[in-house]
């Protein structure tokens, strides 16, 4: 979340609002570090950029799972009114699934060797799993 206040992330938020025709404050998910809201997919994308903006990433899962899993999980948890326990469970599931997808694909080097960024290639599965858990799917 350290990058939430950077100009680069502010530019991402403005560009997405303009491209999607939404105004600042219109939506159900918070842009971290602001008082603005956006539709959940937009907020999750901008918040993911904020996580990664300062290169202070976590390690584990599919290398930097937090940049993908956390924005989706926190946004969905807010939307459904999840408890802290439900949120934490969903985050753990998200990291686990992202890692399993990476391992199933041959590991980090296998993804890197074909030009795929494992964070985005595997993290999306983890984000989807975390959101699905919170939605009780």
Summary of predicted features, one role per range:
Residues 1-137:
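N-terminal core-entry segment
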């Amino acid at each position: 979340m350290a990058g939430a206040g950077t100009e680069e992330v502010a530019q991402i938020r403005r560009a997405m609002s303009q491209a999607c025709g939404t105004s600042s404050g219109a939506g159900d998910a918070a842009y971290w570090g602001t008082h603005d809201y956006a539709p959940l997919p937009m907020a999750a994308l901008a918040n993911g950029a904020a996580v990664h903006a300062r290169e202070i990433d976590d390690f584990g899962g599919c290398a930097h799972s937090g940049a993908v899993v956390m924005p989706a999980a926190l946004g969905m948890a807010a939307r459904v009114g999840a408890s802290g326990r439900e949120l934490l469970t969903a985050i753990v599931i998200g990291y686990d699934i992202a890692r399993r997808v990476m391992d199933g694909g041959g590991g980090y080097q296998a993804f890197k060797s074909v030009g795929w960024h494992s964070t985005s290639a595997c993290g999306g599965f983890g984000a989807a799993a975390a959101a699905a858990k919170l939605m009780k799917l």
